[in-house]
Design a protein with these regions (language model features):
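Polytopic transmembrane helical bundles with strong interfacial aromatic enrichment
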Residues: 1-150
Length: 150
């Protein structure tokens, strides 16, 4: 995203210039090797990357909701509500930063917001891994301090 400056082409949200899926992506003639090799020569790959990035974001939000609702009782029981709270907070910040980068990318990319968006993504991933670890750990042991039980 950042190397392609894709936000400059579609600085709108939630739609990409009024379309959920840009028409250029649906144009089968645009799906050729040249558009993938010389990606900066036309709008096709920029639109595709922007669409895929947004779609992954939407899927991550759905997955995060699943994590929140699935793990909450386990986390509460294990005293991990702080990690869950941080995960939810960082996810909301991540969404806000991503939308802000798009909406403020008119003529120039807001580099600081973009870098923060990337940094918070690392935090969200780290917290998701921690939550997954404790969820998996819960299925192996009944208590966080009782490491002898299988």
């Amino acid at each position: 995203m950042s190397g392609m400056k894709a936000a400059l082409v579609y600085p709108t949200w939630p739609l990409m210039h009024g379309e959920f899926i840009p028409a250029i992506i649906l144009d089968l003639s645009a799906w050729n090797v040249d558009n993938f090799v010389d990606y900066d020569q036309g709008p096709f790959l920029i639109a595709l990357v922007q669409f895929v990035h947004r779609s992954i974001g939407y899927l991550l939000v759905i997955n995060a909701l699943y994590i929140i609702f699935s793990f909450y009782s386990i986390m509460k029981e294990r005293g991990m509500t702080l990690v869950m709270g941080l995960f939810i907070t960082m996810l909301i910040i991540q969404i806000g930063l991503g939308i802000s980068v798009l909406l403020k990318s008119i003529g120039t990319i807001p580099v600081l917001i973009g870098v923060l968006h990337q940094a918070v993504a690392i935090l969200v991933l780290t917290l998701a891994v921690i939550l997954y670890y404790f969820h998996s750990f819960n299925s192996l042991v009944s208590s966080p301090l009782n490491l002898d039980k299988p």
